[in-house]
Each structure stands twice: as structure tokens, then as C-alpha cells.
Design a protein with these regions (language model features):
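N-terminal binding-site loop/beta-alpha segment at the start of enzyme catalytic domains
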Residues: 1-83, 126, 155
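Intrinsically disordered, low-complexity sequence elements enriched in Ser/Thr/Gly/Pro
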Residues: 2-3, 85, 120, 130
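N-terminal small/glycine-rich loop or linker at the start of catalytic domains
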Residues: 7-26, 85-103, 132-135, 139-141
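Charge-rich, low-complexity amphipathic helices
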Residues: 35, 54, 61-62, 91, ...
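A short linear-motif detector with a strong N-terminal bias
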Residues: 61-65, 93, 109-112
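Glycine/proline-rich, positively charged
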Residues: 96-166
């Protein structure tokens, strides 16, 4: 397996990342365990998940993928062998069951802390190596919407710094 530095960190990640979004919906916990075992045995040390998973997102499977990964960490005692990436969900129609509801989702400090704390609990770990914004909170030119309006009051990055460094 080939490895690369993750950005400017000292973390060496495999060039192949295991995507886990189907664990808990299309794949059972045992399927997930088998896939993670297989990947790790072949040198894949980079796993990607999100609070929103399993896909297709539904209330009944919300956070299920992170729970399966957490169960695997607990059973295999191998958290230190994995570079783990997860993501926070943001405003999106149909996500009323995440935190306080889709209209209140965002990248503010309250939401970010709540999302991280819940992910850590599901993942049965005390750290996430790479934490990402899953979907932009701002309007983006997607699905035929071509206009982008810059919002100079957007403080997402400031919030991320506050959460990370406090």
C-alpha cells in the first residue's frame, strides 16, 4: 500500500480510503466488520464516515455507521491503527431528526460541539483525526442554481477554530 501525508500533518494515510456510508443500511454490522478487517489487512488505514450515515439518510439509521465503526474499534482494540475522518451535517431539507432539526442545523459552535460529542460517543473514541463540513451551509451553485452570493458575515472558519482550539 502506498501512503501520503495528510495535508501538513504528520499523519500517513493510505492512498485508498475506505468509505463506510452503507454500513447500517445496505451492509450489516458483520459486513462492515469484514470490510474494515479486509481493508486494514491490506494496509488501508484511512476510513471515512459521517454523522449522517448510513445512506440513504433516515431517522432510523442516523449515526448507525459511526456506531458500527465504534463497535469494531471496541472489539478489535485497534483505534490507533486507523486515520479516521468524519463530517458534520448541515442545513438540508428532510433532516428534521438531526440534532434540533434541519432548519436549526449549521456550523455554529453549539451545533459543531453537539455533532462532535455525539460522533465521539458513537465511535467509542476520544478523537477524530480529520473533521469536515459535509455539505456547505451557504448557497452553492448546484443542481442548476448558478448564482453564488458571497456572505461577508459567514464565520464558519472562526467557529471551527474556536471548537478545535478551546
Amino acid at each position: 500500500m502506498k501512503y501520503r501525508k495528510l495535508g501538513t500533518t504528520d499523519l500517513d494515510v493510505s492512498v485508498i480510503c475506505l468509505g463506510t456510508m452503507t454500513f447500517g443500511e445496505q451492509n450489516s454490522q458483520q459486513d462492515g466488520f469484514d470490510q474494515m478487517d479486509y481493508a486494514l489487512e491490506r494496509g488501508v488505514n484511512f476510513f471515512d464516515t459521517a454523522e449522517l450515515y448510513a445512506v440513504m439518510p433516515r431517522k432510523e439509521t442516523y449515526g448507525k455507521t459511526e456506531e458500527i465503526i465504534g463497535n469494531w474499534f471496541q472489539e478489535k482494540k485497534n483505534r490507533d491503527k486507523i486515520i479516521l475522518a468524519s463530517k458534520i451535517a448541515s442545513k438540508s431539507d428532510g433532516l428534521e431528526w438531526i440534532r434540533e432539526g434541519s432548519d436549526k442545523l449549521g456550523f455554529d459552535k453549539k451545533n459543531m460541539n453537539a455533532a462532535i460529542d455525539a460522533s465521539l460517543k458513537r465511535l467509542k473514541t476520544d478523537y477524530i483525526d480529520l473533521y469536515q463540513l459535509h455539505w456547505p451551509e451557504r448557497q452553492v451553485p448546484k443542481f442548476g442554481q448558478l448564482d453564488f452570493k458571497y456572505d461577508p458575515t459567514d464565520n464558519t472558519w472562526t467557529t471551527i477554530e474556536e471548537v478545535l482550539f478551546n
